[in-house]
Amino acid sequence: MDITRRQAVKSAAFAIGAVAAVPVAARAQDAAGASSQDAVMRTRISNTSPLLLSAVYGNTPDSLWWGNTLEGAWSAVPDDIKPYAAIELHPAKVCKPTSCIPKDTPELRAWYKHMLDEAQLLDIPVFLVIMSAGERQTVPAEWLAEQFETYSVLRGAMNIENYWIYNDDLPTNAAKYLEVCARYGGHFIWHDHENWFWQRVMSNKAFADAAAKYPKNLVIATKNTPIRDDASTDSIVNGMWLTGVCENWGASMDTWKWWEKHFTKPFDAVGTRPRDMRSYASESEAMIACEMMNVYANGGTVYNFECAAYTFMDNDVATPAYLNAIVPFFRFSLNNPAPSRKDVLARTKAVFWEKDGGIDSLPNFYKGLSMDDESLPLYDSGRYHALPVIMNRVDEAAIKGLFPGAAILTKNSS
């Protein structure tokens, strides 16, 4: 990346993080100092070294859901992909009092430790899901630091799916976790959905400042659980990456949206079949790979999947979706690197700047642009790729520096 473009990225990132009135030069000096003290990264993520995450879910204090084992999960990952893979440890049923909501309890900490002990023994790289569903009382940041000090296989922490229950403790706590991850060379990966949600997150001073300090430790990623706003979510996350908020972006492909569409067979008319649990396990395997293509084509480097009994394995047996869609496309991304940030910046012909209002205030903006049904994320990247959405905190000079020659659209554009 040339010096002018690099400076524009830094300026944009600092603009987003600059809630306090601190001079740009001082912020740049502080960031440079923090960067020089960062630990060696535990996982390398880039367009030439993407990351494939595969999830296992907690069942009892010492077991996993769906008959899986940690050893079996790692064995299911092909040897040529293992250097680019890690296992997501999701506590799921271990969470009390509500499944999948990781409130800090002795049982939760014991499960984390049990799984980390096993991962260390078997030398399996893992990420801990420590935030989800708006839970405020998660494990303390310093507890996470202790695990980094104890377990070399711990690669980072994850925050997953809070869009339906936002509260301002989420970004405040996430900032603390991001700082710990940066201290130990880990990644903090945050999967979530909808433009408004990410706007709220970046309006939180603690998180915006942490993101500005530690962009290389932060992965911002989509999570397309509901049947709405896939294109605008891709746009805002892509725009955050292009303006330097995070060094990598990605997605969690969620077949739950198939359930929300009432589908139980490929392309059955909506509503013709019962809305039951068969739905999430019947999204066509190839469509999962198509979703990966959208991420890849727009510079994404982190691939994750919900509904793991369908997208990864059960009873220690890899699923057809994993073997026939996810693995083949991930191999393709290894052999044919996704476009770099420099590549995406250079090819971008237009951006949407939220100076005059958010893109979500324009009903049906995307309808007919890249898709005819925004409830399914198969057409988010059209002929002109994803349209980056730039937060209003980034000034016009920074945008022009990043995207020379690109049209800058706003809500009031003719």
Task: Identify the residue ranges that each predicted region occupies.
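Glycan-processing catalytic domains of CAZymes
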Residues: 34-414
